[in-house]
A protein has these predicted regions:
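Low-complexity or membrane-interfacial segments used for flexible interactions
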Residues: 28-78, 84-89, 95-104, 110-202
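Cys/His-rich metal-coordination motifs, chiefly Zn-binding "fingers/knuckles"
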Residues: 1-31
Length: 202
């Protein structure tokens, strides 16, 4: 085989040209394929002084989920995510016990099984959560409401709030489709924290 850059002859299977360092076709074939990236778009579709409602669509505009926060009292906050046929996809329940002003939540499957806890790390300028059952951490800031999901120190998803949008709108990007509802659930967690902070100021 020959280097496509300098023409140097090499043994078959050589990954980099010893003459100029150019990557060969063998190296490209051996490199792992980049993971697929999925995107969903979460837009507010009506809200009251207490609760938010959202529609979640894919890039083609297909409705994938509906979501709503449910403020049961001044101190209890929950949310639900539904499929388009109104079947429940995920429930988000605030844990009753508050520690150092942290708001912790349980993400619960339709069969009642715990998917993960969402444990808030109290920080001055960030929304920071740990999802211990999934080995995921979530970091975001108060101002932009953009946040990133990490597993083993590597980013696996991100949520970006649309700045020039009417109401609260988010782009949700991720590489692990099995965690799709978890990412959406964490958007709802942040919405519940926002609602709680708003109620405390009243």
């Amino acid at each position: 085989m020959f280097c496509t850059n300098c023409g140097n002859q090499m043994a078959d299977g050589t990954r980099f040209c010893p003459q100029c360092g150019t990557q060969t076709g063998a190296a490209a074939a051996a490199a792992p394929a980049a993971p697929a990236v999925y995107r969903l778009y979460m837009d507010a579709k009506g809200l009251t002084m207490l609760n938010y409602k959202f529609e979640v669509r894919d890039a083609a505009g297909n409705l994938r989920y509906r979501a709503a926060t449910v403020t049961e009292s001044m101190f209890t906050y929950n949310a639900r995510i539904y499929y388009p046929n109104d079947a429940e996809a995920l429930a988000i329940h605030q844990q009753k016990k508050m520690t150092m002003m942290a708001m912790n939540f349980d993400l619960v499957a339709p069969n009642g099984g715990l998917v993960t806890q969402a444990m808030q790390n109290v920080k001055l300028t960030k929304y920071s959560y740990t999802l211990p059952q999934l080995g995921i951490t979530v970091d975001g800031d108060f101002l932009s409401l953009n946040f990133v999901f990490y597993r083993n120190g590597q980013p696996i998803g991100a949520v970006r709030k649309k700045v020039m949008a009417w109401g609260d709108s988010y782009e949700v990007e991720y590489t692990d489709a099995s965690l799709e509802k978890v990412f959406l659930g964490m958007v709802m967690v942040v919405q519940l924290v926002i609602a709680a902070n708003r109620n405390r100021r009243r």
